[in-house]
Amino acid sequence: GGRARVFKKGSFIYDGGPTVITAPYLFEELFSLFNKKISKYVEIVPLDLWYRFVFSDGQTFDYSGDEKSMEQEVKKFSDKDFEGYNNLVNFTEKIFNKGFTDLSDKPFNNLTFMLKQVPSLLSLKSYKSVYSLVSNYITNEKLRRVFSMHPLLVGGNPFTTTSIYTLILFLEKK
């Protein structure tokens, strides 16, 4: 969803949307509700490059869904942070499973239900910001910025948005 458009300023092209992430498997699920296959109607084309980060010193980080490419990109900045990156991804899978799979379709309109979620949300470090959680796993400042950017996609600030939003990092991989 969102503002599917681009605009140009000088030699740069900016993406003006869409701003909401929708995983392809959710479209497949929607079509299956009507006993249809999405592939008969739409071709979903995977992108080789999802984002390119350009830092003020000219260094770039090409963010993609390809694990080998991601390993090379992370190691370009910090060999030791590759293990931290993998640990971060593994932790965000737990956040995804709770925050997206278990809770995204549940109404939080009952105090008892909300209170029952507190222990698991605490164990998932939901009290931390996205940037703070990423910093537990990644030491290189540029890599911290790369892996903290996901709240920006939904209008959030990585320094203040709850770390539950790191589930987007894992959602992208599904």
Region locations from a protein language model:
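Residues forming the flavin
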Residues: G10, L26, G156-K174
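A short, structure-level motif marking secondary-structure boundaries and short turns
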Residues: F12-I13, M114-Q117, K174
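Generic alpha-helical structural context detector
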Residues: S32, S148, T166-L169
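Rossmann-like flavin
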Residues: S56-T162
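N-terminal glycine-rich phosphate/pyrophosphate-binding loop and immediately adjacent elements
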Residues: G1-K94
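Short, intrinsically disordered/low-complexity patches at protein termini
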Residues: I38-S39, F108, L167-F170
